[in-house]
UniProtKB/Swiss-Prot annotation:
UniProt keyword annotations, A-Z: 2Fe-2S, 4Fe-4S, Biotin biosynthesis, Iron, Iron-sulfur, Metal-binding, S-adenosyl-L-methionine, Transferase
UniProt GO MF annotations: 2 iron, 2 sulfur cluster binding; 4 iron, 4 sulfur cluster binding; biotin synthase activity; iron ion binding
EC number: 2.8.1.6
SUPFAM superfamilies in the cross-refs: Radical SAM enzymes
Record's subunit section: Homodimer.
HAMAP family: BioB
One GO term of the biological process aspect: biotin biosynthetic process
Gene that produces this protein: bioB
Protein name: Biotin synthase
Binding annotation for [2Fe-2S] cluster: 64, 99, 157
Known role: Catalyzes the conversion of dethiobiotin (DTB) to biotin by the insertion of a sulfur atom into dethiobiotin via a radical-based mechanism.
Domain Radical SAM core, chain residue ranges per copy: 2-223
UniProt entry tagged with the keyword Metal-binding: yes
Reactions accelerated catalytically: (4R,5S)-dethiobiotin + (sulfur carrier)-SH + 2 reduced [2Fe-2S]-[ferredoxin] + 2 S-adenosyl-L-methionine = (sulfur carrier)-H + biotin + 2 5'-deoxyadenosine + 2 L-methionine + 2 oxidized [2Fe-2S]-[ferredoxin]
Length: 285
């Protein structure tokens, strides 16, 4: 049996893009800022299944179905459930994650009954700083959705974004709030500036990002997935080994919601060169 550290790979599928009416200052999917991104209504379920099959072939264990918008409604929950059922029927071995905004306990139970394994809802930043990045909904609403996920029996995936102008205390408060939820997995995102967005610059560098990974690892524990997600290529390109040594054990492969990521083959070569194994089963964690 290999003793090499295993890295868990996750792929994201933006199945409804660029239609959100909220005012989150970090998000190109908001219609308020007119960012130059691809915007479209629901993808065909057959396309979602085919993209899931490709993600699995690229080594992904996690496959996240993401929709733009504040939260779930009847139409959205039905579509995500049907997409999940189709993926589960056609592609074996994927941990299906839904990321669809605020959600009630009843909606989350419905998704679980139709094949979703985990629900992603990020706290984004500290409760204190949240009004600086969003006014159309509150931080507490996000926290309550995470509590609903726990109550539903779904695994919780919850993290945040760093580098949006927040203070060091805000970062510590965010990580403490995430830890209080005891999520099974936590994505750490690092802000990717876009000229259309109100937040123009990123106030975080490589060493600070490493410290966030170390602190998250300490607070969350060894038995949780700690994923470096958005912004990885901006801060850790060529320095991925330090990221993993700091405690990260998961990355997103392929593209993000509206920005390009590394080609999956490049990530696989990087992991092989550094001496890590791609995890082949969620049971191994």
């Amino acid at each position: 049996m290999s003793t090499r550290k295993q890295i868990f790979l996750c792929a994201i599928n933006n199945i409804l893009s660029g239609t959100c009416k909220e005012d989150c200052k970090f998000c190109t999917q908001s219609v308020r800022y007119h960012a130059d991104i691809e915007r479209y209504s629901y993808k065909k379920i057959g396309q979602i299944v085919e993209e899931a099959r490709q993600a699995k072939a690229n080594g992904a264990l996690g496959y996240c179905l993401v929709t733009a918008g504040k939260g779930l409604d009847d139409k959205k929950v039905d579509f995500v459930a049907r997409a999940a059922q189709a993926v589960k029927a056609e592609v074996e071995g994927l941990n299906l994650i839904a990321c669809n905004g605020t959600a009630s306990l009843e909606q989350l139970i419905y998704l679980k009954e139709h094949g979703i394994d985990s629900y992603n809802h990020n706290l984004e930043t500290s409760e204190r700083y949240y009004p600086e990045i969003c006014l159309t909904h509150g931080w507490q609403e996000r926290y309550e959705t995470c509590e609903n996920v726990k109550s539903s029996g779904l695994a919780l995936c919850s993290g945040g974004i760093f580098g949006m102008g927040e203070s060091m205390k805000d970062r510590e408060d965010l990580l403490s709030a995430i830890a209080s939820l005891q999520p099974e997995s936590t994505p750490l995102n690092f802000y990717h500036p876009n000229p259309a967005l109100p937040i123009k610059t990123r106030n975080i560098g490589f060493e600070e990002a490493l410290n966030i990974i170390r602190r998250a690892h300490t607070l969350l524990g060894e038995d949780r997935l700690l994923m470096v997600a958005g912004g990885r290529e901006l801060l850790f390109n060529g320095k991925e080994d330090e990221m993993f040594k700091a405690g990260a054990n998961s990355i997103v492969i392929g593209d993000y919601l509206t920005t390009s990521g590394s080609a999956p083959k490049m990530d696989q070569l990087m992991l092989e060169k550094l001496g890590y194994e791609v995890a082949t089963s969620c049971d191994s964690h």
